[in-house]
């Protein structure tokens, strides 16, 4: 019998202190990591529910355990809602993460040793798109494409590599690319060599849902995403498709369970269902439009302050600041900005001479600040403060001045009130 009178801060003060400190950090630091966001209290309520107790191996109506009639409702709601969000006719909401969703796609459609063609991590791709340190680069023969001197995807190079290497799968998507992707061009390249087109839209799923970024659904054989980032839900993954054959759907279903996962996380799936409902609200489109406006305001301000943005600007929620040739590294810049209560992540940029542990770049994103309520002028102010720190990363007076300004700005825009 559990006592409702015992509080976490009494039972486990060490952990409670860490949780409280993190809650405080999220309130008084500005969050510019492009892959992070704040989910709603409703999402957190669902994720903290009694559904965390329930095992439910299988799928709605086809479980290997009894007592699943209510979690079936939760999962079916998530499935139907995400189909509506993206105009899909197939959806699997069970992947525990975006990386596991990607792994499921590879294992469902490929054999070990098959060739895949994906974007280089060093040029803005993701670990799971064929990086040698990832299972996708170990199980499969991964060929990588990149960006040109303008920082744009070189579609001619993608076509040349596809023609030369005859991949079984072409992977489109990114973790650090700030322009729109020509999904139709990617599909034409894949079709030219008889390959699957697999799109990982983890970073831009919320923008796609709101119609402010082109949708890959009409072009890709299969699409994956995380459910956090711009989609603003709990941490997790999904697989969706439009026009997928029954055979393809069966392969995807069986590889998620029982192929690579056992029991799904029903409390997380319930939280996904809440987030997907939120994504169908008119306010969600307004939010995503503001995400892009804020990103463009930040990028333009940094350019005006003399900083190079890879590709020259942004058409989505993120930007890469290229500091090749500057004395400050990405690692040092991240640390200096952190002292000023601005949270970012160091990031490699194309042709980066520094190691991935040091880097010559910063990745900045606006989903989290936009959730707080930031508008363009707030983003311009923030970009100027970032430039102030980057101009003088060891000047304690500058860091203190910016920290005070950031703290005041955060108080105007509380996350949870």
Curated annotation (Swiss-Prot):
The keyword Transcription does not apply. It comes from the Bacteria. Coiled coil: none annotated. Its cofactor is pyridoxal 5'-phosphate. (6S)-5,6,7,8-tetrahydrofolate binds at residues 121, 125-127, 355-357. The modification N6-(pyridoxal phosphate)lysine is found at residue 229. It holds the Pfam family SHMT. CDD domains: SHMT. GO terms for cellular component: cytosol. It catalyses: (6R)-5,10-methylene-5,6,7,8-tetrahydrofolate + glycine + H2O = (6S)-5,6,7,8-tetrahydrofolate + L-serine. Its EC number is 2.1.2.1. The keyword Transferase applies. It is found in: Cytoplasm. Its main location: cytoplasm. Keywords: Amino-acid biosynthesis, Cytoplasm, One-carbon metabolism, Pyridoxal phosphate, Transferase. One of its GO terms (biological process) is glycine biosynthetic process from serine. This is Serine hydroxymethyltransferase. It comes from Xanthomonas axonopodis pv. citri (strain 306). The gene is glyA.
